[in-house]
């Protein structure tokens, strides 16, 4: 048996039912999972839903539902997508599950102990619907409101304290690993 191979779809935001983009990403991931299995790799293929954030909260409020109840309903449609498309995923994870929280807590504790994360602040123009930050040159003022030039979605200025991973510390080792593998 060849080396292990891990593949995942994005963990989708269940702010609305799945669409063609979700199907496309899932099918591409499934293709590579099946290919690697045929090539003799031990494959673990994961998909699931990421159930947090402003977009989820706003979608739940718009539906007059509790965010978890809203996610329960929409997440089920993503799980059904796997069956409908006959995907070969080994697991479906929801970020609201205890097993996910436990794994994240364990990883967090390891990173904190090794001083790989730090508390800092970030700020910028953020679009909830696009789930993206934009630079000043990527937004415009339309009738007194700031919007993204590329999507037309409203943006709002946000400033938050958050934890960050020291990715730049790992740049050279990662580039070396990629070039060798």
Where are these regions (language model features)?
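N-terminal, positively charged nucleic-acid-binding surface of large information/translation enzymes
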Residues: 1-181
């Amino acid at each position: 048996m060849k080396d292990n191979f891990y593949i995942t779809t994005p963990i989708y935001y269940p702010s609305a039912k799945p669409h063609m983009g979700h199907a496309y990403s899932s099918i591409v991931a499934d293709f590579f999972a099946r290919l690697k299995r045929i090539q003799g790799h031990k494959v673990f293929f994961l998909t699931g839903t990421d159930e947090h954030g402003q977009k989820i909260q706003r979608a739940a409020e718009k539906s007059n539902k509790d965010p978890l109840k809203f996610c329960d309903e929409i997440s089920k449609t993503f799980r059904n997508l796997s069956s409908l498309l006959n995907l070969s995923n080994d697991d479906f994870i929801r970020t609201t599950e205890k097993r996910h929280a436990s794994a994240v807590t364990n990883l967090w504790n390891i990173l904190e102990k090794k001083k790989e994360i730090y508390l800092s602040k970030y700020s910028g123009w953020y679009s909830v619907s696009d789930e993206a930050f934009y630079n000043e040159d990527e937004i415009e003022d339309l009738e007194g409101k700031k919007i993204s030039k590329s999507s037309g979605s409203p943006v709002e200025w946000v400033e938050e304290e958050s934890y960050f991973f020291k990715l730049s510390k790992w740049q050279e080792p990662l580039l070396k690993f990629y070039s060798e593998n």
